[in-house]
Amino acid sequence: MNQSISSLIKLKFLQSHSNDKNGNKKGGSNVSTGIDKLRESESYRSPFLQLAEIQEHTNNDDDKLDVKECEPTKKHSKLSRIRRKMGRLDLNFRSANEKGSEDDEILVAQHLRNGQDPEEMPFKSENNIDSIEKVPKPDGERVTLTSSGSDNVKRNSKHAPFIPVKPALEKFPSSNRLSRDYRKSQEPTLFNGDRLVPTLPTVSRISTSSSVGSSTAASRYFNPSKRAVVASSSSSSSSIKFNSLHAIPLDATPQIELAKQQDEISKRRFGRRRSRTVDVFDYINKNNTAKNKPPLSPSSFIRTIDEKNTNSLMQDPMGSRGPLLPDDANIISNDTDGAEASHPDHQVLSRSRSQSTSFVQGKGGKRKSIEDEGYHNKLGLPHGSGPTSVYNNKSNANSTITGMSRRSSSIVNALSSFVNLRSSSLSSSRQQHLQQQQQLQQKLDVSLEDLPPVPAPEFSDSCKDFLIKLAPYGKFIGIILTEKDDEFKKNCLNYLLTNCFEFKNDPLDIALRKLLMFLELPKETQQIDRLIMAFSFAYYKAQKSYSKKKGIECPWSNADQVYFIAFSLLMLHTDYFNPNNKSKMTKHDFVDLVHNDKYSGGNEIPMAVLTYFYENVTAKESPKFNYFLMSPMALDDSILDKDAFDTNFAITLSSNSMYSPIDMIKRGSIIPKEASLSPIFYPLTNSISASGIAPSTAASCPPSTSGTINGANLGTANSNSNRPASNSISSYFSYNPSSSSSGNATLVQDDINVYSHIINDTLNEVNLFPEVSKYWNKNALKANLLRNEEHKYEKYYSIMNDTKGGYLRFHKSQLNKLNLPNFEILNDNSRSGCKNSDYKYCKILQMGAIMNLGMPSRKFSIVNSAKIHWKKEFAILTSLGLLICDKMDWINPQMMKDPKSGTTNYIIDFKSGFSFVPGSTIDVYNGLFADRERDSLGKSHFASLVLAYTEHHSTGSHTSNTTAASSSAKHNEGVFEPSSDEEDSITNSTDGTSSVSNGESDNDSVSSSDNQLSSNDSNEDYHSIKDEYPIFEDENADCLLYLHTCHRNFIWKCANKYERDNWIDSINLFSAYDGCYVEIGSIANTICNKRKLTILQRMERLRSIKSAKWEKLKKFESTLMLMGKCVPISTKTKTDMINRIRQLAVRMDWLIYEIKRSELFVSIIKEVTRKQAEKNILEHGKGEEEGQGNNDDSDGIDDIEESFLFNENSLQVCVSDSSYDEYSNE
């Protein structure tokens, strides 16, 4: 294929040559035949044939130039020849010496004056004819063809069609390898030591952030050491012309132009390719001042530059290499036959961010590594700062300015100037500071291979004995014990994690950080798996023991579940902080991935806890801690770094204690007290400030003053400035200056330093247990709501069963104003024509005036802001539910006799238009439950009512909450807001019966108002239990009643304790039998709540509700304890966790409400049934049926009189026949 193309190009060349010859004949041009033959020679045509081949691919029209442009005119034939001569490519080399070139120029000028053609001058005998190496020898020697003659080679215009019309301009500065010094040193014998003319401008090889795929075209395709081509040029001219439109630089060559054309074709084919963003640390001009520095560490402790280069041979196929760092594998020398020449002398530059390899330009044009020049001990920039290239800048200072001025209009020039500016700014003290820190880290960076051989366990060794032998190895014990799948080492690892680590109070993410803080993470996957498995077993064992001690359910199912979550967190950390990973795992992806795993138990972990895990793991990268400060190697202060510890390692072998992080933390020092051989050590708390310590960037000095910790006297400070503070928490961190993988790698001011709290054993000060205690009353389950003293359940049960009593009468037109639940009519006798067919009756169980706690209004003055607003209201408990009205001026009871039952009853007419009627509807409250203590069923139920007064009492201001009587307050009173899934499980049943009888409902009679979070109270701070509600200190607690309803909650203040107990007993008795088929004595057309269950079914349903809610509560309690252990690093995470704790506490409060309510109702039904059974036995023994009826009637009258606020003197006895006839059935 290549030969065919080459033949076609030669044919085109001959045709064009023939056309030029014919054109010259027409113009009357007389050119000698010998000169034409010379112009057709192969040594001259080869470069242009290659250019023609490239140009044919790019533009087929480029090789069809107008021949007329090259036709010489008779008038200016000599100048035309000179112009055509200058339009040909210059190969950058002068004649034998500079003086000879100047003589040639003078000679050419004299010939022009005399009218003689300078091309007819005799050729010189020197070997200066152009030559090109075509095929390299197999043995690596270079073959160069030179012919004698003058450097003013005769050229013909017949070759003009092969001159490229649109040469590719160079976008990057040329390589220093093409400089004068470079080529002179490359082939010193070829030019016999003669001085060369300046060629390509030498520019400093400072890379830019350009996204062009390759470096310089010249450095990629041209190898001056492989060929030598000689031509003439003028030293005073900056450029020569191909034609009148295009200018080619003076130092251009056909090979360079060929490389440019190929590079341009590549760019057109592939387009612009993005390279990675250039970091400031990637390109820094460093002076070669480190040649004479002594090595900082032995060569056996650090990898050589050659090893780093070997590891960096993995290259990005998409060209992620820096723009100005060429890939020498792509530096190819192309000739007309397509031959390629490799360059083994050039090393590949690494773009790894973790390894810094520096290069210098050595003699002979070869780029040698620093190791060859005595730089193998030189430390590069810190990890993550990118590779640093060092070049010989002695001959580049002036050439850089020249090269940049020629490309002043290029965007590359601007970017190069910007990088130069930034690079120069980094030569400040901060850069030196980072280098010093890196040098210190290199000295303190120890691997397991640097330590003496690990002793093998003996047959008689126990786990403790072997761990004592491994104590000097410090944090590498985990790697040693997980190296092989050995049963004895596995038991030793379990023993170490169980007895030397304390995980019972730590969340899983903090426990994992603590593990990796004291034990090095192995590099092998199997070793990591063994370590995480042993950690999961120890963590689950500690958590289960702690939960059993607290009497709660363990939040973890088994050790496999802990292993799954721990390994997920480890993978998340690796994924998030990997600088090469551009697509980080999002919070939603992590939570969804773990929570959907049913096989490993990930679905049992609450999503709120998984969200906390993600935010905490990604908040801070886990650092690598220093071996010398986290192991017994810190015993001897003479051990400064790894250069000296080999001779002192035997000191620690006599230690009789294990490597125990518990002892290190409790003693406040990493040095075990019984193994301390030196009195000079420093506590961990010396360098810890109250605001938290961020990783130190410099070697901190030991404390200057002595002190005590835990009663132990401390020695004087170490005066050695080469060693950091022995136990300074700042020196524990491995400094990473880049941390570009995460935007929140640096701690915010409000965030906590979790490692400081681990070292000082103060994690309990930053966990969320204090927040849990604000919202959760752990003693709520122990409360006994059934009073042991005398109660009046039997009394109100008799009132409900007896016909005689009080009734509230409604006209049928007024029933639509009552917000009534499902009801039924007892003794229905509403036939048309009857006088009482238009009225309905509700039986009254209890009524009276109460003081209701209202919400504070804006009308209050600042002086009265601390006073509680008690509003006087009137309450009526009926067979339908509870009615509350503002005033009682409409109450006018009348005594009427029922002709069917023969009883005299009190009738109160419900009259519309009075003050208690709000307008449209009247709420009838159901699902009632009364209590004498505010927090016996949880802290969230009445918080909305009390917090408003607590805020006013503490600040003297007033909120804009509506009053308690407002119907809209029921939607805005709650302080807590459940989540969306919680609202589905909490239903607002209209009565106690429907909550337990309706199979479709969740059987939760809860208030909708207490399930919503008011935006104004979302950030309220709760006080301690003692000072939580100081406004009730002046109130009599025996007169306060706390009422739960399905609509809202109330706080009542009764006149005395007796009245309060009556209200509590009547409300709870009514709710216990609500919806049951119990005998209700009533007159005709009495309405009550619809009855669905028998008493036995009602009790069975209440027991099942209690059991189901109890199981759910135990799970919520374990989840709440899991949230309480959380240690959020960021402030945002802490705020979110507090809100989730508060929402969970609300759900738990309502579970307690259902449990205790069901328990109390079952107890009431049992108690009343027992009393009724005893009464029936006594009545059956007496056998006095008539006396029983009279006694019952009299008892009923007494009960009714006791239950009303008014007595018979205030009643109007209606004995007229008209009233009697109206009340009668017929």
Curated annotation (Swiss-Prot):
Residues 17-39, 113-158, 311-405, 954-1022, 1178-1198 are annotated as: Disordered. GO terms for molecular function: guanyl-nucleotide exchange factor activity. Residues 405-620 form the SEC7 domain. It is found in: Cytoplasm. Pfam families: Sec7. Keywords: Cytoplasm, Guanine-nucleotide releasing factor, Phosphoprotein. It comes from the Eukaryota. One of its GO terms (biological process) is exocytosis. Guanine nucleotide exchange factor for Arf GTPases, stimulating the nucleotide exchange from the GDP-bound to the GTP-bound form. Catalyzes both the GDP release by and the GTP binding to ARF2. Has no exchange activity on Rab GTPases. Involved in vesicular transport. The SEC7 domain is sufficient for nucleotide exchange activity. This is Arf guanine nucleotide exchange factor SYT1.
